[in-house]
Amino acid sequence: MNEETMRKVARFINETERELRTVFDRIEEIEYVNQERVLNAFCSEKVSARHFAQTAGYGYDDIGRDTLDRVFAKSLFCEDALVRPTFASGTHAIFTALAGLLESGDVMLAVSGRPYDTLETAIGLDDNPQPNSLIRNGVIYEQVDLNQDGSFDLNGIETALNRLENVKVVYVQRSRGYAWREAIAPESMKPVFDAVKRIKNDAIIVVDNCYGEFTLETEPSSFGADIIIGSLIKNPGGGIAPTGGYIAGRGDLIERIAARLTVPGTGREVGSYAAGYTQFYQGLFLAPHVTAQALKTAVLFARVFERLKLTTMPASNSVRSDIVQALRFNTAQDLVEFCRAIQAASPVDGYVVPEPWDMPGYNDQVIMAAGTFIQGASIELSADGPIREPYTAYIQGGLTYSHGKIAVSRVIHSMIRNGSVRF
């Protein structure tokens, strides 16, 4: 690529960045509010160096673990929380919560359409449900799809609530998974929550909050969610937490889930962590800022692709409720080349060339760019997508906005070399 083309690309990106100043200002205002709330949670719980210590054995009276639970709960507008390094993924945390709340004969009503692929298997929505999946254990699954515009089908939800007996859990997925829709803002969930409390007051509202924490000034718990769940290698870990997940919400429900987390009769009172808790506290403290960096990166990608006349979701000026940006391509090869360009702009394994593969838990081959310090950490700049029509890449994360801007530039360079765009 000649120097003149490279200068044109740099000017193009700088012009795009200037267009986004108002959007970036809004993101920074949200960051400030969230940072102050997290700081207040730390101060309220008198966090000190003793809370970071390593623990071993049963973990009785582990003040680092128990204080971290309370700091997380306050940061997310909740009564209580279980924050555990032992959650292997967000799906693991979600399944633990659902399995702790649902018994044989109970109905799980999903009101945001079909969950994403890995949770489908955990629920038992495959043709042959796996052992220990919810359906194999006697749980009844029902579903109400979203409207075509991505909004809740409130009439359909109310009809289902009136028709079904034994609705124990009403389930909402905040982020899009591999669906072509915007994430659901917490405020938009309130009419559903109100309907649930009016029609089935004893039903438990559970929200998969993955990718959404700290993107707005509120969380689903601000509007009536009973339980919210997420992964520490996404937003709330701040790019620092090396593993884990959280379940937060009503105190009585957290105690019930804790009996499933370990064993009945012991619950949350056990569970040590030999590596110590420093990274989890520090990650939470950094989370509002790192999430804002990821949002700015997503917005820049969106606006650049809009200016290149490609299809994006959400639009660059949309109010965002998660860190994910969807970008649509004409061919499978364009999708693959995009992910390869993201990988090449990564600090870890930047020399690796991603290939589509049969990823456990997914029904189609998936291409993933994940040159991350922490394996699978989608708060770090990463991209992925299933190899199926319409060919869509889902890009998320970015520990620093500068890295995101560099990655945008290198993606454009790759597209020029491949003949996808011209400058």
Language-model features, listed with the residues they occupy:
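Conserved PLP-enzyme active-site core in the AAT-like
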Residues: 2-21, 28, 37-44, 48-51, ...
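Solvent-exposed, charged/polar functional surfaces in cytosolic regulatory/catalytic domains
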Residues: 71
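Conserved C-terminal alpha-helix-loop-beta "cap" of PLP-dependent enzymes
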Residues: 306-423
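Short, well-structured beta-strand/strand-turn elements
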Residues: 79-86, 348-352
